[in-house]
Design a protein with these regions (language model features):
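Mature, solvent-exposed C-terminal subdomains and processed small-chain segments of exported/organellar
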Residues: 1-83, 88-168
Length: 168
């Protein structure tokens, strides 16, 4: 698969109120092994910094009524494939897209606020630990990690070593 998206934009018009949108951003796939797990954790942190409910962008879009409680986002990393996706309902999906792109550029230029990064890192780590309470989640994570050539349960040590610079 090429490093570029097949098309920059695809729009389908249907009678729906409110409109539903999905944004996708292709990322470089990670190599197998511990680097795969590190990239997964860094991608999740970067996604939270950009789109998470604690991020400045989320607060702005929500207060302006451009997104609602149905807004969702995530970072996925598989052997040979990586992506960030976000979607939900919006009266102006293009304004959401433009705001996400602008905030991504701002974060790349200025970096992530140190306090926000520390909170997000604790939150992502906490979510991983809480995920251990779900047998289904553990099975999925172990299987995906196996195919990526890494031991999933090493995530605590890998997580500790991730710095703000890694997520930026």
């Amino acid at each position: 698969e090429t490093g570029r998206a097949a098309s920059a934009e695809k729009e389908l018009t249907m009678e729906m109120a409110p409109p539903i949108f999905q944004l996708g951003f292709k990322a470089d796939p990670a190599p197998a092994g511990e680097e795969h797990l590190r990239e997964q954790l860094m991608g999740e942190l970067a996604c939270e910094a950009l789109l998470g409910s604690s991020s400045p962008l989320y607060a702005k879009l929500y207060s302006e009524g451009l997104i609602n409680k149905n807004f969702g986002y995530g970072f996925e990393l598989y052997p040979g494939c990586a992506l960030m996706a976000a979607g939900g309902e919006s009266r102006d999906p293009k304004a959401v897209r433009d705001a996400v792109l602008a905030e991504g550029e701002r974060l790349a230029r200025e970096g992530i606020d140190e306090g926000l990064f520390r909170r997000l890192k604790k939150g992502v780590y906490g979510a991983k630990v809480r995920g251990l309470n779900s047998f289904e989640n553990v099975c999925i994570e172990l299987a995906q990690a196996h195919f990526a050539g890494v031991e999933y349960l090493t995530f605590p040590g890998v997580s500790v070593a991730i710095s703000k610079a890694h997520a930026e």
